[in-house]
Amino acid sequence: MQAVKHWLKTSDSRLAKVCFDVINSIRFFQVPTISMIHKPLYWLHNQCVTGWANLTRILYWTPLFKSRLTQCGSRFYLYSGMPQVLGNLSIEIGNNTRMSGITTLCGRSSAVQTPLLKIGSNVDVGWQNTIAVGTRVVLGDNVRLAGKVFLAGFPGHPLDPVARAQGMPETDDQVGDIVLEQDVWLATGVTVMAGVTIGQGTVVAAGSVVTRSLPSDVLAGGVPAKVIKALN
């Protein structure tokens, strides 16, 4: 098959060019858009998709996920499926919190005590977030996590190459709490390392890597993240 594709693309023969043109004509054929037909169909499609998503969210995904939680407040809103939960992990969620189902929540498997993920009230946990809990991860009230945020409470592997090759877990000195105080906002793609506390009201710019604790009410960014300016 690869030889045929190569022949069609590179051969100077008339047969190859005709075949190539015919295949492309079939490949890129499109039905004409008829507004009177396709606009209502588009609306109907969206209504069906939304209705099915809400039905499965209410009757299936939300109760299924809540059965895994240690504690869950009122008005919890789960959308786009159900988060993947890995390892031994205690999860507590406050009131009026929203969470994307395309999220991974992971507890350190070698922990002596059960790792704790504590999420406050009115918190947004966005699309493709990963929260790896080594000991404890705390998200205060009104925290906002944009898409692809990574809270790395443990790394998963030791620094020693021999131990790593043997499949040994990370060492205790690589593990730490992560605390996001009230009103913190992490923009898209932010990574927060173990042992970090981010103070109340602080905003971290997209793509930053936070390796050290940040004070309250500042804008921070960069790799590693540094304070850019005070917000108050």
Predicted regions and their residues:
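Glycine-rich hexapeptide-repeat left-handed beta-helix
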Residues: 139-232
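Domain-scale signature associated with acetyltransferase and cell-envelope carbohydrate enzymes
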Residues: 1-153, 181-182, 200, 216, ...
